[in-house]
């Protein structure tokens, strides 16, 4: 009992500290880069006009653009992004809670809330690209994971009403148009669930009606996304090699790259072992689950790891086909949640078989709090100067704009100074620097990996860059702008 109580207290402490950390950062978060392009389109055309234009000319992820529009409207009303961040935290915690409560109904509800919040937080901290959580255009990758959890809950819950079916349709449609890397994984999971229900009910399809409904709607949304005219426009800018050897080589490289980026972040996912052990020990005390003690833990780890490997391959495969490379790390954000689920599942079986990992608990969480404390120390003090720099730049440009309007000058190019560099070297950056030196020892110009929790709202030295044009349009400037080249 002391062991379980210790884990519960530590998880609660983690939740409090991480909540403070995430909300403090959200207070300083601002729109950046593509956000302003979308902001301008949304202001001119409205939500549906914006989605229609991007669908026809850029990309088919209609539901992703819909969620982005909602966040931009909130920012337009409130002037900050605290509310979307808070809603995402609450939704992610509640989605975890619903699923855990369904599978583990005998565990105390308050403890399930603590565990649910903890699992969501370590999934966020373990993101391959943490800026995904705060970048409006990219945060949809996380939101769709949460929406998928809600979808699975409404599909698997025993009793259903008309509201549940409506929610299944809406959630399925949103997930169908989420991302080419993510939707196929959801389709596969729903299909597995359909097969399970089919054989469990002795081939009576009526027992699988919710699963079949979700499968059909997600698939329709997926087709609508994949065959969008805008996809052809975007893909035309990439080179492709559809030969088997070319795809295999690209897939191998993409998987190796993913592994390199994932390795330093896997620590956060391993923390899911401890709430898993907590749940497993509680289940082990139930006589009805005594048979699970006879299942080999090594066998469970092997099977779960094999499934994890297959999911990772399926995740990097679309990028290998579409752009012949590993997609941006933000598009693989859902793998952070998959890794947490993997270790949580293993932890349950460790707990059932009375593995406590007693000595690892304090060590792991001491390391965790040291890492988080360092992030607090390096990031929070720099957030205010970062925001001040953005405001100062904008204020100067607006003053200059008024002067140019007064003088009647046109076709002017104004050079502005780049933002101060508030990025810093964390352990992940040091690791990536080392890996680059091993893989590319003769590269003359090496990548200088540096980190900041937000995507920098930096412009280009080219006045025709889309970011410069969007920034100019947002401020209604009467002159072109460009960054002074370093």
For each of these PLM feature ranges, what is it?
Residues 34, 111-156, 179, 313-348:
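Membrane-interface micro-motifs in multi-pass membrane enzymes
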Residues 6-21, 113-120, 169-170, 213-220, ...:
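Alpha-helical transmembrane segments
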Residues 23-86, 135, 173, 180-331:
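Transmembrane catalytic cores of multi-pass membrane glycosyltransferases
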Residues 4-58, 68, 72-112, 207, ...:
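Intrinsically disordered, polar/acidic, low-complexity terminal segments
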Residues 2-3, 100-111, 158-163, 198-209, ...:
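Membrane-interface helix-boundary motifs at transmembrane edges
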Residues 164-166, 215, 294-305, 350-376:
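Signature aromatic-anchored transmembrane alpha helix within multi-pass, membrane-resident enzymes
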Residues 154-174, 212-213:
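Short hydrophobic alpha-helices at membrane interfaces in multi-pass membrane enzymes
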Residues 91-103, 147-159, 174, 187-195, ...:
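Transmembrane alpha-helical segments
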């Amino acid at each position: 009992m002391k062991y379980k109580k210790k884990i519960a207290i530590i998880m609660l402490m983690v939740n409090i500290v991480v909540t403070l950390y995430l909300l403090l950062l959200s207070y300083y978060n601002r729109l950046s880069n593509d956000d302003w392009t979308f902001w301008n389109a949304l202001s001119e055309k409205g939500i549906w006009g914006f989605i229609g234009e991007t669908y026809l000319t850029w990309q088919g992820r209609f539901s992703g653009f819909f969620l982005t529009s909602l966040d931009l409207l909130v920012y337009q009303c409130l002037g900050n992004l605290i509310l979307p961040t808070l809603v995402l935290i609450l939704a992610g915690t509640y989605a975890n809670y619903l699923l855990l409560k369904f599978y583990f109904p005998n565990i105390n509800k308050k403890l399930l809330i603590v565990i649910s919040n903890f699992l969501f937080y370590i999934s966020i901290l373990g993101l391959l690209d943490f800026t995904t959580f705060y970048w409006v255009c990219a945060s949809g990758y996380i939101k769709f994971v949460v929406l998928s959890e809600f979808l699975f809950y409404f599909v698997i819950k025993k009793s259903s009403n008309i509201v549940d079916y409506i929610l299944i349709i809406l959630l399925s449609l949103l997930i169908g148009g989420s991302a080419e890397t993510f939707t196929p994984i959801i389709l596969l999971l729903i299909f597995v669930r359909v097969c399970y229900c089919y054989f469990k009910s002795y081939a009576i399809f009526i027992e699988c009606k919710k699963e079949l409904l979700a499968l059909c709607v997600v698939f329709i949304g997926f087709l609508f996304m994949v065959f969008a005219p805008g996809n052809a426009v975007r893909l035309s800018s990439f080179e492709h090699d559809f030969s088997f050897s070319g795809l295999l080589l690209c897939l191998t490289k993409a998987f190796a790259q993913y592994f390199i980026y994932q390795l330093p972040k896997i620590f956060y996912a391993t923390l899911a072992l401890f709430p898993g052990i907590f749940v497993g020990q509680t289940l082990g005390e139930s006589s009805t689950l005594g048979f699970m003690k006879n299942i080999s833990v090594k066998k469970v780890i092997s099977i779960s790891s094999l499934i994890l490997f297959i999911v990772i391959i399926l995740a990097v495969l679309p990028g290998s086909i579409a752009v012949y490379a590993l997609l941006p790390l933000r598009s693989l954000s859902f793998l952070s949640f998959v890794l947490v689920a993997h270790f949580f599942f293993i932890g349950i079986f460790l707990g059932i078989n009375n593995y406590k990992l007693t000595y690892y608990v304090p060590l792991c969480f001491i390391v965790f709090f040291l890492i988080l404390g360092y992030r607090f120390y390096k990031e929070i003090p720099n957030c205010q100067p970062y925001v001040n720099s953005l405001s100062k730049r904008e204020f100067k440009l607006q003053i200059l704009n008024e002067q140019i309007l007064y003088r009647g000058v046109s076709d002017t190019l104004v050079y502005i100074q780049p933002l101060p560099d508030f990025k810093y070297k964390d352990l992940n950056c040091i690791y990536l620097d080392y890996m680059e030196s091993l893989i590319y020892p003769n590269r003359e110009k090496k990548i200088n990996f540096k980190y900041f929790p937000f995507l920098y709202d930096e412009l280009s030295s080219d006045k025709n860059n889309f970011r410069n044009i969007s920034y100019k349009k947002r401020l209604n400037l009467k002159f072109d702008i460009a960054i002074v080249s370093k």
